Amino acid sequence: MSIDPASRLRKFRYSDTKKVSKPKPVKHIKSKKTRTVANYEGLNDLNPSVQPDLQVLFVGFNPGVESSRTQHHYAHHTNLFWKLFNQSRLLFWVLERNGKTNNKDDLLLNQLTINGESHATAVNDFELIKYNIGFTDLVLRCTKSAQELTMQEKLDNVPRLLREWNLAQAKKIVIIGKGIWEIIIKKQGIKVQRFDWGVQNNAYTQWVCSEAGIESDIHVLPNTSGLVTSMNFAQKLALWNEIKN
């Protein structure tokens, strides 16, 4: 009895073939990236410029390499701090509050104010203490980026920072960077739930002022680093102008 071709084909396909197991997928194990620690040997901390009864105290995250090298705040040429400082005319506002509108005999002011415009730069930071404008940082240690600071190091510096605020008793405390404000609040074990740029009027502010023993207006402004582009210059300048209110 002959087997028809169709039956022979079915017999071959279902009876004579062996099951072939599918190869298991190979898992690719990602190699762990090792975090390199930058060497900043030879770069010194940048000292604060703080004294009692300041009109304005600026607070940065920590000094960058250029600021450490030159020993001046916001010294990198891409940083917008001094451009915002000058265009906001904050120096003139401070002079009015100090009652120093006549600068004829003040050689430094004659250099800083030319034809009714402010021309301050990083090299003037420590000189501005003469007009009750001060500078400090959350962390005084130099790094290329604030991301290189550990959370513990940032938290450990909050008490020192608040002591400086207490000494300064500044009318306006201007924090350059939202992250600084969040660290100060985190020190109390609280996470910021709601945030708006500019002057801070909330329970967080009340706690910070109580801890520092101050009655200052606290303004939180965007970081002025050239690496931060989330807000354009005009928007940043508008927030700086609010300091004078």
Regions of interest found by a model, annotated:
Residues 67-153:
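Short, surface-exposed acidic-centric catalytic microdomains
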Residues 54, 64-69:
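Short N-terminal binding/cap micro-motifs at the start of the first secondary-structure element
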Residues 161-181:
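Proline-aspartate-enriched helix->loop->beta-strand connector
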Residues 1-48, 52-55, 75-77, 84-87, ...:
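C-terminal capping/extension of enzyme domains
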Residues 55-56, 172:
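Structural motif
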Residues 62-66, 79, 140-143, 178-182, ...:
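Short, solvent-exposed loop/turn segments at secondary-structure junctions
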